[in-house]
Amino acid sequence: MSVPDRKRALEAAIAYIEKQFGAGSIMSLGKHSSAHEISTIKTGALSLDLALGIGGVPKGRIVEIFGPESSGKTTLATHIVANAQKMGGVAAYIDAEHALDPNYAALIGANINDLMISQPDCGEDALSIAELLARSGAVDVIVIDSVAALVPKSELEGEIGDVHVGLQARMMSQALRKLTATLARTNTCAIFINQIREKIGVSFGNPETTTGGRALKFYSSIRIDIRRIGSIKGGENFDIGNRIKVKVAKNKLAPPFRTAEFDILFNEGISSAGCIIDLAVEKNIIDKKGSWFNYQDRKLGQGREAVREELKRNKELFHELERCIYESVQASQVPAAACVDAESRQVAEAAK
């Protein structure tokens, strides 16, 4: 078949498909603008936003946050909700664990008066509510807390001790098949919080796994593994927070397996000032000599906590350091592009 004939045959096939399934059912990827634009919601931790590679969690996708107990899963999800609201968006929280603290959510920055919350009786109801909210197209982010608490209706109606093999996994697989396309069409972000369990009889490799079967692992565009790695001491040697380490276990939108660390303080959630300090020291924007932190010719303070308080007071300095960090990250990406351009010029010159 000649090239003109193939072109006419393709045009006829496209015309028939659009007639059969509607306009826009098939198109060139380059002309599909939404394929290039990924809108995101910030996580509240600049180090995690940079590790994700796209500046936050993506809208129109499924995100899984998993980790052990008291590792900051709900805190991270609530920060994402708060940031979505600050952008003028609408957020919904499906509290299957019946454990969301409104006072703590408000302390983090969530507008609890505008935050929609549902506490369904069974897993099918929770996932149906999430699908209906996403289908409305009016919700920016939906948090499901947690997958482990999504109890299938038949298990709820049965007796304690009854065996229900694979029931939750089948429920999740069926729901995610419907939910994925709806989220992409309405540009809604769904965040599933998940717990970890240990496989029995595993001698080699990682014995940890997440609940709900394999479907969520496949359908998630981003999987965030969050762990507590230490405590933060305050006055009189009391714990005032936790040091958190996050690993991007899966990422369909940027290189995976990047890590980030940040602080979660009990009285404010994720410490954005702490993230700025860590990144600024790492990028040599802030000079750390002993216990003193210096920025240009200015002494910021002695000790990390003193600098944190200074950045919380001085928002102008906070945003200046944040801008310097972004500029440093962008500058570090330039040499790779420059090398490609130089190589292209060499190839072009050799061809001459």
From Swiss-Prot:
Classification via Pfam families: RecA, RecA_C
GO cellular component: cytosol
Intracellular or extracellular location(s): Cytoplasm
Gene Ontology terms, MF aspect: ATP binding; ATP hydrolysis activity; ATP-dependent DNA damage sensor activity; damaged DNA binding; single-stranded DNA binding
Alphabetical UniProt keywords: ATP-binding, Cytoplasm, DNA damage, DNA recombination, DNA repair, DNA-binding, Nucleotide-binding, SOS response
GO biological process terms, semicolon-separated: DNA recombination; DNA repair; SOS response
Domain of life: Bacteria
Record flagged with keyword ATP-binding: yes
Chief subcellular location: cytoplasm
Amino-acid positions noted as binding ATP in the UniProt annotation, renumbered to this chain: 67-74
Disulfide cysteine pairs (residue numbers): none
InterPro entries, sorted: AAA+_ATPase, DNA_recomb/repair_RecA, DNA_recomb/repair_RecA_CS, P-loop_NTPase, RecA-like_C, RecA-like_N, RecA_ATP-bd, RecA_C_sf
UniProt similarity note: Belongs to the RecA family.
Classification via PANTHER family: MITOCHONDRIAL DNA REPAIR PROTEIN RECA HOMOLOG-RELATED, RECA
Name this polypeptide is given: Protein RecA
Organism: Chlamydia trachomatis serovar A (strain ATCC VR-571B / DSM 19440 / HAR-13)
Gene: recA
